[in-house]
Amino acid sequence: MKIFLCLIAVVSLQGVLAYDIEREYAWKNISFEGIDPASYSVKNSIVTGFAHDADSKKIFITIPRLNPVPITLTELDTTKHPEGSPPLSKFPGSDKLISVYQPVIDECRRLWIVDAGQVEYKGDEQKIPKKNAAIIAYDLTKDNYPEIDRYEIPNNVAGNPLGFGGFAVDVTNPKEGCGKTFVYITNFEDNTLIVYDQEKKDSWKISHDSFKPEHESILTHNGAQHILKLGIFGITLGDLDEEGNRQAYYLGGSSTKLFRVNTKDLKKKAGQIEFTPLGDRGSHSEALALAYDPKTKVIFFIEYNSKRISCWNTQKSLNPDNIDVIYHSPDFIFGTDISMDSESKLWFFSNGHPPIENVQLTFDKPHFRLISMDTKKSIHGTKCEVKP
């Protein structure tokens, strides 16, 4: 997911008190439980993604490996640490991971990650040798989270794994079992979507014009403008239909448009695929990630340029008049991840530093903030609320 996600929100407590925030964590820097801070680089320990398991009350947090970041997949027990800036613990199920950008939890309480298989810096190839990118799943229902699935993505499918963006896990019939699962991974550099069929242990990639950057995005930071050019980045899944398929909603990192495709088409290794443009969210609404809430039928967007969380009810047409804002802060700089947990809680994260070269982090303010809100409360009184 390229290190620009690692170069990412000097976040303070200003400007957020008016929002109905249920939980908030804020770190000036990341520390690891049981590891001497002198043994690793604080400035390189940049969180990019997370997933909250509502059953265990644990948050799984990813830190792409830069030299010398000791752990790429960690966990946080929210029962022990309900707020503040707690240290992160090593995820017990991972010993040989190279570099992970984002975790996802599915309906079967499996934690999925995509290991890029390589790091983004030179000089330590002997210490951290390059491997094939891999899709890995862990069982959160068992002690120590045993690994239950691993698939190495062929190089001709993975392309440049440092271009992996978000991904979504599609369990086609969770009520009857978890064996039939697909994983959809975006690649914003190659402008492709990777499909993994867990049952058949096969994968393929799809290309389409809607995966390409729509334009050059202008990111304003400290009064200066910087250009980003990012292809398909965020993806989220809608409701299951009677045939076990869903609508997959996706967006480009340098686009204000939203598209959808039926997963029925994505699951076919060869064949015609119908991609549908849904509309435009409006100027300066570029986002890296989005999350669908099945209870409210609302999609939430984490907008990196406008420093806000916006919403759109999928039962309405998509245009700027039907977009609303549930959170905004001038200090919410370059949000990187957003997701729903199984209790319909919305979680979103900013890591404090935009993708700008030669910008030094300062550690007198929180750089990382993780916030949760109740979805129904957050959209109450907004355009995203559909009243009966």
From Swiss-Prot:
UniProt keyword Signal present: yes
Subcellular location: Secreted
Keyword line: Glycoprotein, Secreted, Signal
Annotated tissue distribution: Female salivary gland (at protein level).
Signal sequence interval, chain numbering: 1-18
Glycosylation sites: 29
GO CC annotations on file: extracellular region
UniProt function note: Probably modulates blood feeding of sand flies on vertebrate species by binding and sequestering different mediators involved in the host response. Binds biogenic amines. Binds noradrenaline with medium affinity. Binds octopamine with low affinity. Poorly binds histamine, adrenaline and serotonin.
Family per similarity comment: Belongs to the major royal jelly protein family.
Name of the featured protein: Yellow-related salivary protein SP03
Species this chain originates from: Phlebotomus perniciosus
